């Protein structure tokens, strides 16, 4: 037996499917090693759904071959479009009974048939005979199409995660507003106590907005979400000094950052990388990838 065993090197490849492109980021032993993007034909991804599984699978296969990316430990994101989440108060139950109880609550609370969703949940807090549970429903067709595309590329995903949850993990703040703005998609996450208090994702595909127009839409949706949260939730409200952390390709522009900062009455910041990385990494653009790399599986 060797007394000096080499330390195990963990290589993880994260993959984000946007409407416009694929974004990859690879880590080795917890450090960012390489990253990049590959443009997608228009219409191949629409409303978060891969419309041609075979074509997408071939593109992913070519990307992984061309960039020499590892296929053994791949963590992929799923769009937040059409996903539904609820925070509910339930009786405190043993684990053996929780699954059925969550399904019953989801059937009552979710606006979509739960047969069309993959459900997951996490207990947020327990007090006395009650517990607060975060329930998430993601459309089955979104996940199924992505799994099939990865299989075409000879990849069995090690894990998958919803894009808004990956962004919350990447930003790593107890209280924050996370704004993600891409060419065809807008996402806003209100984070309280490190947990998703309110999450919304909007498609911009059919709106033909300029970048300032997209930011105006972001500001409008943000104001409505904060007002809704503060009026309807228990606990401390989201204050005027809670910062907005901007992510996504649109905010790679200094002009876009300044436009938002001038339009909202709260601090606007860029996130820093939660893991060691080269200085030249555009953290905001690859924030979802960074959050995927932090996922514990």
For the regions a language model picked out, list residue spans one by one.
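Hydrophobic/aromatic-enriched cytosolic interaction surfaces used to assemble or bind macromolecules
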Residues: 1-297
């Amino acid at each position: 037996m060797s007394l000096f065993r080499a330390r195990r090197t963990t290589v993880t490849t994260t993959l984000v499917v946007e409407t416009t492109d694929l974004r990859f980021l690879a880590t080795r032993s917890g450090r960012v090693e390489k990253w990049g993007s590959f443009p997608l034909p228009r219409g191949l991804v629409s409303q978060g759904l891969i419309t041609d599984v075979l074509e997408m699978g071939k593109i992913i296969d070519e990307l992984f071959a061309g960039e020499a990316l590892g296929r053994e430990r791949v963590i992929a994101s799923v769009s937040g479009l059409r996903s539904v989440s609820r925070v509910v108060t339930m009786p405190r139950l043993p684990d053996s009974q929780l699954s059925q109880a969550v399904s019953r609550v989801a059937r009552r609370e979710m606006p979509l048939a739960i047969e069309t969703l993959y459900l997951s949940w996490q207990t947020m807090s327990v007090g006395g005979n009650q517990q607060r549970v975060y329930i998430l429903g993601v459309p089955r067709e979104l996940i199924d199409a992505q799994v099939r595309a990865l299989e075409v590329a000879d990849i069995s995903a090690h894990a998958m995660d919803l894009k808004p949850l990956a962004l919350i993990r990447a930003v790593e703040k107890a209280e924050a507003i996370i704004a993600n703005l891409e060419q065809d998609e807008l996402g806003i996450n209100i984070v309280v106590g490190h947990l998703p208090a309110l999450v919304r994702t909007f498609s911009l595909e059919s709106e033909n907005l300029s970048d300032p127009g997209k930011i105006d839409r972001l500001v409008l949706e943000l104001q409505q979400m904060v007002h809704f949260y503060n009026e309807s939730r228990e606990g401390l409200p989201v204050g005027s000094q809670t910062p907005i952390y901007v992510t996504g390709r649109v905010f790679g522009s200094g002009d876009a950052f300044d436009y938002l900062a001038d339009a909202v009455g709260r601090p606007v910041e860029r996130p820093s990388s939660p893991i060691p990385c080269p200085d030249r990494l555009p953290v905001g653009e690859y924030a979802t990838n960074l959050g995927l790399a932090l996922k514990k599986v």
